[in-house]
C-alpha cells in the first residue's frame, strides 16, 4: 500500500501517503480540522495560504475538468468554502479567455519601472524613493532606462509585444517633458502591431496634471490607473499620502475629459483606523465616479514598509473581510466582474 497509518497526539488515526506532497496535504488538513475544533473558526480558503487559488483552478481547467468535478475536488482537497471554490473557478475561466489572446510561443510583455514617488506611503514596500530625495538622479535614470529599452527592443525584434505596463513607484512623478521622452523612447524601439494593452499607472493624484495626461493621451495609451486607496481624508493623512480626496476626483474627471475610456482605480481594505462604514463611504464615492475597473487589495504589512518597522505595527482589522465582501458587492452593482485574484496570504 502507498499509505501508512499514523496516530495523532489526540488519539485520532490518519492514513498518510508515502508521497511527500500528499503527506503534507493530509497533515495540513488534519491540523486545520483540529485548530477549527479548538478555536471555533473556519477559513474561507481552508488550508490554502500564500498561493493564487486561480492558478490551481486554471490547471484543472486546462486538464479538462468540468465545474462540478472541480467544486467537489477543490473543497475536499483544500477544505475551502463553496463560495470561494466557485469564485476561483469563475475567475480562472475569465483569465483563460484573456490569456488565450496572448502568443505564448513568441509573445512577451514589457514592464517599465519608475522608482520615484511624491512621498513614500507608510504601507509601501516597493523599491521606490521620494522624488525630493532623488530629483537629481531622475535624468540619469532615464538615460539608463532608454539605453536598456533600446537593447530590449533590439533583442526582441522577432517577438510579438503583447502588453506594456509602466508602473513604479509613481510614473507621473516625471515631468511632462520627461514622460514624453520616455514614451517617445518606447515608440522608437517597439512595434505596436501585436499590442493588446498599454497601461500607464498614473497613480497618485498629487502628481497627475492635465499636461501629463495630455502627453499620455497623445501617445495613444489605452489604459491608466488612478489610485486613491481610500476616499477618507483622515486615512490619507495618516498613511503619508499628501493629497486630498478632491484631488482624486479632479484627476479622474480631467482624464475623462481628455478621452480616457479605460480607467482603473485601486483601493486597500483594512487601512489603519478604518471601519466598515469608512469603506462603504469610499465605495459609494468610487461608484459615483464609475471607473472601468477596480482593484481591491487587503492591507499587507511587509518588513520593508515604514509601517512594518513601526513599534505599533497594525494588525489586520476585524472588519477587513467585511470590507472586501462589500467591495465585491458594490463592484457587481457597477457591472464589474472579477478577472484576477492576487496571491492569498492572511486568509
Regions found by a protein language model. Give the residues of each.
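Auxiliary Fe-S-binding modules of radical SAM enzymes
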Residues: 1-65, 72, 301-303, 310-347
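Short beta-strand motif preference
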Residues: 4-6, 112, 226
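N-terminal [4Fe-4S]-dependent radical SAM core
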Residues: 35-42, 62-110
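Residues at alpha-helix termini
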Residues: 37-38, 76, 218, 257, ...
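Canonical Radical SAM [4Fe-4S] cluster-binding loop centered on the CxxxCxxC motif
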Residues: 105-140
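Short glycine/serine/threonine-enriched helix-capping/active-site loop
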Residues: 112, 296, 341
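Conserved non-cysteine loop/helix-boundary elements of the Radical SAM core domain that shape
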Residues: 128-326
Amino acid at each position: 500500500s502507498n499509505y501508512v497509518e499514523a496516530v495523532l497526539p489526540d488519539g485520532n488515526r490518519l492514513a498518510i501517503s508515502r508521497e511527500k506532497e500528499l503527506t503534507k496535504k493530509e497533515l495540513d488538513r488534519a491540523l486545520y480540522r483540529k485548530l477549527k475544533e479548538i478555536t471555533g473558526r473556519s477559513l474561507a480558503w481552508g488550508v490554502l495560504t500564500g498561493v493564487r487559488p486561480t492558478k490551481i483552478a486554471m490547471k484543472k481547467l486546462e486538464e479538462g475538468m468540468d465545474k462540478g468535478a472541480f467544486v467537489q475536488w477543490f473543497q475536499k482537497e483544500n477544505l475551502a468554502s463553496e463560495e470561494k471554490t466557485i469564485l476561483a473557478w469563475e475567475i480562472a475561466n475569465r483569465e483563460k479567455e484573456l490569456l488565450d489572446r496572448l502568443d505564448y510561443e513568441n509573445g512577451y510583455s514589457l514592464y517599465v519601472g519608475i522608482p520615484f514617488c511624491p512621498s513614500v506611503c507608510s504601507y509601501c514596500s516597493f523599491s521606490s524613493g521620494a522624488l525630493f530625495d532623488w530629483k537629481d538622479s531622475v535624468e540619469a535614470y532615464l538615460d539608463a532606462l532608454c539605453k536598456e529599452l533600446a537593447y530590449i527592443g533590439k533583442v526582441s525584434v522577432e517577438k510579438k509585444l503583447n502588453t506594456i505596463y509602466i508602473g513604479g513607484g509613481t510614473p507621473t512623478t516625471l515631468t511632462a517633458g520627461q514622460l514624453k521622452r520616455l514614451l517617445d523612447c518606447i515608440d522608437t524601439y517597439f512595434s505596436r502591431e501585436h499590442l493588446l494593452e498599454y497601461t500607464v499607472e498614473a497613480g497618485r493624484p498629487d502628481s497627475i496634471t492635465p499636461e501629463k495626461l495630455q502627453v499620455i493621451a497623445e501617445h495613444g495609451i489605452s489604459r491608466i490607473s488612478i489610485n486613491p486607496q481610500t476616499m477618507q481624508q483622515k486615512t490619507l493623512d495618516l498613511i503619508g499620502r499628501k493629497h486630498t480626496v478632491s484631488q482624486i476626483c479632479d484627476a479622474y474627471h480631467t482624464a475623462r475629459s481628455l478621452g480616457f475610456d479605460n480607467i482603473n482605480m485601486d483601493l486597500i481594505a483594512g487601512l489603519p483606523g478604518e471601519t466598515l462604514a469608512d469603506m462603504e463611504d469610499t465605495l459609494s464615492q468610487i461608484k459615483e465616479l464609475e471607473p472601468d475597473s477596480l482593484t481591491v487589495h487587503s492591507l499587507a504589512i511587509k518588513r520593508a514598509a515604514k509601517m512594518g518597522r513601526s513599534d505599533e505595527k497594525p494588525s489586520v482589522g476585524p472588519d477587513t473581510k467585511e470590507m472586501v465582501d462589500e467591495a465585491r458587492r458594490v463592484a457587481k452593482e457597477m457591472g464589474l466582474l472579477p478577472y484576477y485574484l492576487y496571491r492569498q496570504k492572511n486568509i
